[in-house]
Structures are given as C-alpha cells and as structure tokens.
From Swiss-Prot:
Binding site for Mg(2+) 4: E859, N861
Gene: CPA2
Protein name, UniProt field: Carbamoyl phosphate synthase arginine-specific large chain
Binding, Mg(2+) 2: E317, N319
Entry cofactors: Mg(2+); Mn(2+)
Binding site for ATP 1: R150, R190, G196, G197, K227, L229, E234, G260, I261, H262, Q303, E317
Domain notes: The large subunit is composed of 2 ATP-grasp domains that are involved in binding the 2 ATP molecules needed for carbamoyl phosphate synthesis. The N-terminal ATP-grasp domain (referred to as the carboxyphosphate synthetic component) catalyzes the ATP-dependent phosphorylation of hydrogencarbonate to carboxyphosphate and the subsequent nucleophilic attack by ammonia to form a carbamate intermediate.
PROSITE patterns: ATP_GRASP, CPSASE_1, CPSASE_2, MGS
Organism: Eremothecium gossypii (strain ATCC 10895 / CBS 109.51 / FGSC 9923 / NRRL Y-1056) (Yeast)
Binding of Mn(2+) 1, residues: Q303, E317
Assembly information from the UniProt record: Heterodimer composed of 2 chains; the small (or glutamine) chain promotes the hydrolysis of glutamine to ammonia, which is used by the large (or ammonia) chain to synthesize carbamoyl phosphate.
Amino acid sequence: MSTAGISDEASASAFTTAGYCPQLIKGIDSVLIIGSGGLSIGQAGEFDYSGSQAIKALKETGKRTILINPNIATNQTSYSLADEVYFLPVTPEFITHVIKRERPDGILLTFGGQTGLNCGVALQRAGTLEKYGVTVLGTPISVLETTEDRELFARALKEINMPIAESVACSTVEDAVAAANDIGYPVIVRSAYALGGLGSGFADDDLQLRQLCAQSLALSPQVLVEKSLKGWKEIEYEVVRDRVGNCITVCNMENFDPLGIHTGDSIVLAPSQTLSDEEFHMLRTAAIEIIRHLGVVGECNVQYALQPDGLAFKVIEVNARLSRSSALASKATGYPLAYTAAKIALGYTLPELPNPVTKSTVANFEPSLDYIVAKVPRWDLSKFQHVDKTIGSAMKSVGEVMAIGRNFEEAFQKAFRQVDPSLLGFQGSDEFADLDEALQFPTDRRWLAVGEALMNRGYSVERVHELTKIDRFFLHKCMNIVRMQKQLETLGSINRLDEVLLRKAKKLGFCDKQIARAISDDLSELDIRALRKSFGILPFVKRIDTMAAEVPAVTNYLYVTYNAVKDDVTFGDNGIMVLGSGVYRIGSSVEFDWCAVNTVQALRKEGHKTIMINYNPETVSTDFDEVDRLYFEELSFERVMDIYEAECASGCVISMGGQQPQNIASQLYEQGANILGTSPEDIDKAEDRHKFSTILDTLGLDQPRWSELKSLSEVKHFLDDVGYPVLVRPSYVLSGAAMSTVYNSEDLEGVFESAVAVSPEHPVVISKFIEGAQELDIDAVAYKGSLLVHAISEHVENAGVHSGDATLVLPPQSLKEEEKTRLKQLAAQVAAAWNITGPFNMQIIKTAEGGHTCLKIIECNIRASRSFPFVSKVLGVNFVEIAVKAFLGGDLVPPSCDLMARSYNYVATKCPQFSFTRLPGADPFLGVEMASVGEVAAFGSNALESYWVALQGLMSFCVPLPPSGILLGGDLSKEHLGRVAALLAPHGFTLLALSEATCEYLSRYLPAESSVTVLQMPETGREVRALFEQHNVQCVVNLAARRASSPIDPDYRIRRSAIDFAVPLFNEPQTTMLFARALSAYLPAELEMRQSDGPETPSYVLPWREYLGFKPT
C-alpha cells in the first residue's frame, strides 16, 4: 500500500491529531452544485451517484447546499439531500438566475459531467462568477479549459515531455483534411467539449474524413485530428490530488478491447491484468506527473494508449472531473472518490480525511484489491430501425454492469449474465454469417462473436487475436471457460457430475442453469442446485474493504465467490432484502434506483436491517453507506436465493427494481422466499397478458378488443372482425420490447415472430389499436386490495407512443371531475381484484364512442413504475415510503388519501430525453417500443410554462430564433402540420418546405402575408448540411404518419439529418402543437431577455420547496 506524494507539511496533520483544525477555504457557507441533467448515452446515472456523494460530504461539513438539476428521477433531487433544489435546465442562463437568487459562496462544476463543466466554462467567460463573487471549488476553470481544449492540452503535456498522439486542432473541414494529409492516414477525429466521444471517429481517406468532420463540427466548435493508434492497449488511471500536491492513484483499469473502441463501450478489467510491474509504475508515475502539472484539485481520469509489445505509450486524454470511469473505480475499490473530491474542493488535504470504509486509515492510502472486477457495457441498438450497430470511438451503450470475482473467469461470466439475464455466461451465437468480419469489425455483439469463434467454430487463440487484437492473455482465460463447457457437455447425465468437477465449474463462474444446459436439455437449474447443496458446495461471502483485508473494515460491502474457504461476515440479522434494478437500459434507469434507495431508507427508518442486491456501478443503491449490507451481485434466482438463505432474510422486496426482479418473483416464492407485498401468483395474473385481459373481462372493466395470438390463421380471423390497426404485445417484457402496431397484412408475420421470440414461455396478445385516443397513467399504492394513494398523469402524445417516451403533465389539466372519479374507481377495482399490497401502475386510454367518453384499461404493472419519482416529487408525497408501510402492515399503514381531489397552484411537466445523436442511422420516430434514455422535468404556473422550461432542459433543444428557418413536412392528410405552421408564422420565422404539395397544403392554413419557401430535396448528406446552413434551419417539424420502411424515405432522411446536425426535431403532432403554443407565448420574453444586459429573473425560477408550499422531509 503506497502513500507516495505526501508532503511533510500535510502529513503532520492527520485527522486523528487531537485539536487539529483543517485549513479550509474561507468564506464558503453555501455551495451551488451543478447536476448533469437528463440521462443520455455517455452521461448516465454515475453523476447521480457522484452528485449525491458530494452533497453528503458538503452537508457533513455544515455547508448549505443548493442543487440545480432538471432530472426529477434522481436520488440527488430527493427530499433528504440538498437544502434547496431547482428543477431547472442546466444551462448558463438558468444557472445565472439561480446564482442571482441564492447568492452562493461557492460552486462545484465537476460533479455534473460534461454538461456541468461546459456551463462552468461559459459562466467564467461571461464574467458571471466574478460578478456575483462565486468561488469555483476544486479544479480551477483554467485547468478544465486546458483539459477540454485539445490544442491547449497538447501544449501543456509537451511542457513536461509527456508523449501524446501527433495531432492538429481544426475548426473547419478543409483544415481537417489538410491536417490529415500532413499526419498521414488513418486518423482519429476527436471533438472538443464533447461527451462520450460524441462526434469522434476514424477515417482512412479524405472522403470519410469530410463526412465525419461535417457532423463533428455541427456538434462542437473544434476537432482534433490525430494519428490513429487503433490496436494499442487502452489503460486508465484514476488519480486524486489535493490543494497541497498530495497525489494517489486509486485504481488502474485495462480495456479488454484494444484502442479504437470507446472505453464506455469496452469491457474493462480492474485492476489491470496484462501490465508488467514496469509498465504499471511507468503509467502511474506519468499520471501523477500530469495531474500535478495541470493543477487538478480533486479527482481526475487519465487515459493511455500503450504499445502491446513495448514500453511506448501515448496520453489519450484527461478528464478533470468525476466521470463514468471514476464511478466504476469507486465501486471497484470501495474508495469513495466523489465524497473525497468534494471534501478536497473545500480545502481538506488527503491525510486530513478518514477512509470512511475502514474508519481507521486515512484517505491517502492507495486501495489494494484481492479480487478482479469486470465491467461489461449494455447496448439496446436492436430497439432502433436502420441503426449502425458498429462500435468505435463514439459511445453507444446505455448502461454497464460490474461483476466481482476471485479470478477472471468468475467475474467475466457473472458480468455477461448481469448484462442480459437470458444469457448463461460466456457463450457464442450462430447469428454471424461472416464470423471473421464480425470479429474484425466490432459491433454490439462482439463478445458473442468471440465466444462463437472459441466455443463453437474451433478458432485458435492466435486467429482470434489476429482478427480482434484482443490480448492473448484474455483469450486464454476465455479458453478455460470453453474447456470446462466442453467437459460438461461430454457427461450426458447428472449422475456423472461429481463433486470435484462441479466445484471446479462453480469456481470458473458457471451458474447452475449453465451447467444443467451443458449436460442435458432435460435438466433444470433446480436439479443442479439440489446436487450442489448435497455436496455442500455453497458460495462464500467476501468483503470489499479497500485494503485487501490488511485492515479491519466496519462496512458491509460484499460479494459472493466460490474461490474462498470462509465467509468474511456472520449472519443472523434477519434483514429485509431489496432487489435493485440491475443494468441501466432503455426502460429501466435511474427512476428505479430512486425507488430502491427510498425503499431501504424507509425500512431503516422503521428499524429494519436492510440487504441490497444490485450490480450497477452507476447507482446510489450500490453506495456502501446506503444499506446495512450491500451485495454487489447478480439478480438471478440462483444468486438471490443463495443470499436469502445465507442471510436468513425475513422478507424480500421485488417490486421496486423494475421488470428484472419481477421476472424471478415466482421462482423465489416457490422456493419459500417471503415476498413482501403483492403475491407473485397475483403478479403473474397481471404480467401474463392473457390472464390479465381475461380477468378484466370477468370484472366487466372496459378494454380494447383482444385475443391471444397462437397462430397467424387465428390472428387473421380476429382481424376480419376488428380490422387494422392492431397492437401486438408479448408478456413479461420491459419498455415495450417487441411490441408493435400493425397497420397491414404485410407487416403482420414479422411482428408475430418477433413477439413470440422475445417471450417464448408466455402468451402474446393482440388487441385493437384505437387511433387518436388520449393516454393516462395512474401510479398508486394499495394495502390488501384497498387503494391508499394515487396520481393521474396525462400524456401529451396520443396513445401509440410508449409511456416512457411520453410527455407527462401532473396534475391533469384536461380531465373533468367525473373522469377523475371514474379513474380512481378503476384503480380501486384493479387493486381489489389483484389483491395488491404495495405499488402499481396502470395505463388507460380515453376515447369517444357513440358520443360518450370511454376509459379503457390497456395495462397494469404491479410494481413501481418509472414515473414514481415524478409523481412523488410533484405532489410532495413519497409513494415509495407509503408502499413500504403497506409492506410492513399493521399500525404503520396510513389512511387513504385522495391527492387528485386537492387543489394545486402549479403544474409539472416531464419530457423524455433521447440520444439519437449517438446512434447513427437510427430513425428518430416514436412508437410503442420505448426509445428514450432519460427525462427532465420542470414546474410552472401552468402546463405551457412548465413545458417551456422543461424543454430547455433537453440536451437536443435550443430555442429557435427568428428569422431562422423552420423546415416543415410530413403527413398532409391531417390538419396538425397546418395548425403548427399557423402558430409559428406570425413570429418572423422563415417557413421552408421540400415539395410544392407541402407548400400548397400550408397555404390553406397561413395568413395571406405569410409565405413558404420551397426547396429541392437534397440527394446527399452533404447537400442536406448545405441546405441547413444556407437557410439557417434551427428547427425541423416532420409529422410523418408512419415509421420509414427504408433509409431512402425522404421523411426519414430529413429527420435523421436534423439529428446529425444538432437541429431540434419535432415529429409527433400533439407535442409539436404544444411546442408551437409555448414558443408563441414565450418567444417575445426570450428575445427581450437575450437583448438585455441584466435580464430579470423569470417568475418560474423558484426552488421546489416554494412550488410545493412546504419543505418535503
């Protein structure tokens, strides 16, 4: 364990010295923390974790904390953390308004990702921080600018003779081409001030470079053209430095994939596995030298390219802020990086800070690991049409998992099961028509291609290495798994599986189901489980303590392994187990982490010991100090049951982690686990589409006409009766996976096959799709079938857009009192019919039939939904806390309360955040399968105001200003496009169309003095970009009636071009109308504010507390 870099001055003042008083930065009583905004690809839940840690650290030191973050789903915007929360856009303008109102003494910029950092730089350049006397805490802005500006960065590293890739900073396409010709192809292009490699990529010639730079420079003011080092090893070091120069390296990590794939899309191992001692210390020394020379104060990430067969290395980049890698390093080592960085920002030095894990060592001890951590990314590219599935220097993954084991094989296999529960471990797939190509040109299925080559196609380690450039060490480790798999396959019968072989397989990370499947199709995982237990083969529980057990630890940060001889902990507390959400993916994100964290907090408040199981390094729920016992483990039946039995748990909460815990509820229940809340038998009656619809019919509750889909011939009989369009829905899926709206017979067969494939063990239901219906969400909590509390949110979009992609308004603005009463009755009837105890969510459509309003139930999930944080925070009532009291029962159960009967003088709107910019080729068209990756929300005095503020919190939006161009197109058979144009025309925008037919259509809606300029449809991407630039297009409205069937579809090309060139896109009629109304209402004030030197703070810039009228507790 190393204490290198500690000065004499600092080490004399260790935190244990009696009477010692740290020399903190003076005059800092209140601190503004900049959040990262809505989750997106490249900037996800890791900033909720780091921001929450920072707030804890500041409050512990007695500082008043003010947070600005529109992401209402986060833990950091919870009741119990910051003193003041502003649900406002993270932009320089809104941050300025908050600074004027709150007058903070200090500001933290490095806990809000790239968004927060960019805002800080903009505020400094505008003179705002100096004007209001706000001190930047931690790393100075000049240092942040140096690390973000590629030219300044290169110059700084050359000052200390640190090797970097030869590079040239460019601000035009022609400059980039000239630079590449000087450097020599292949080159990599990197964008300045960009997140997750956005706008970066490789180019082998001038044509590729021009196409890449055209897009990159639309997203960033500067690009760096540098010599490609594709194929070198990629190594990362997490470094911490305090104000007096003490430095430690907290963790070093090695990418399984060679350089060329963004680290966020790479499999990562910690600690590094293939470095020699010389290489390790060479890079460690360089990292410390870099961070000292730059002057970073706090946490920093240094990325290297290392020559595979020599000691040459190049510095790729430095992130002088908390990042995705720092969250991983923090969870991998147990060292609280964000907490420590926040303390350092206040002026503490490393020797003055205790290690909160051991409580007996100081923070300047470098962590030591006696285990291996594997991080594997999760992609959801299959949800998108026409998307480019190759992976490279621009990040595309939506989440990641972290697995812990005592050897590579154990951690590696765990990680793959965590990424996708349908997988058994390291395995192949027969999907690759050209396996060599799949290995050489990586996609999101890369590791399956490696598994197929080694496990099923007989490729040698050398051949796979030549095609992939993956280090031979890793491939030989994979071969250990392959050999065990082959050995198991030869057995043929469980009777031939002896104790020695079974134990060896478990030590290599094989799960029970994987072993059963290898031996015989007739075996189940329960067969292997019974045999394993009869042999006494049980996993051991080990502790992560940052010190490799050299120093006793007081926390319970745990993992499970078969590579041990004893447990590190004792059992018998009979705690309540809470299952987390697992990997972030489209449909399951930070919302469920909020639910899980609030569950354990509510349980602890009632005096119960808590056990959390989760494996997501980006989450607050996997923070060591949130629960009594944290297991960084799989959410599989096998692992959950192992822990449940070892801990002698008194109960298990499966309804707060989204769909994944729900999917194993029945297995846990059948094996004797005490499931708190609704019985899994009743849950199954809601998850199974056939059972659900049958019960609704029995109760006489209205729903769209439906039938169980068993064969295409039966479907056609149903269609003869109800007609198109219809909705096809599988059971037990999340975020509308494989759900489709079918408009014609040509699409039906493919949709049918996809739905059956995604949920083969459960029925698929087909129902009549009712066009033009309004969709409503009900979030509720019940106790033994009686409704306790509910909230009704309105969708802005009509039914047909997944609820996770919908814009929600709460309280509802267009519902009549009798409709709200009927909705409450429906919720109460469902709660009673399914005997619900705990959370549930319903989706209902409102439609007119025969002159009457009809409310039809379309779905019910007996678990917390992704809108639980939204309704809890908007209404000021914690739905999760009420659900926990329902779980516990007795006198704790609160009386029923009708929140929808109350009067509210504010409205909140939640908007989805998409990451189409990150997904080249993906059609940004909304449908019944979810596509958004995050959300933002805002409060206002009315729905229009709250929507206008929320909209500005989206990364993809900037306010279009007249006389800029707005390009209009799409479905001309309905009036939506014309009504939008009529609202926009009076404000001086230049209205553009790409056909005479569109122009003629629009003329019917526009006043005589308005005109539409008709442009010719561009044929190439370069021509589209030229058109956008020439006509200053700042907004695209494309209301196509259907998703594009082909990439040559004109509407698709325009939608995709808007995304590629960072132009706001509106493509859903109701949302577009709301946008047009909001722009008409607030544009005059926006223009006036932009022209004013000291604009007045808008009335909607208020803290959450003032909207509610009380401070939530």
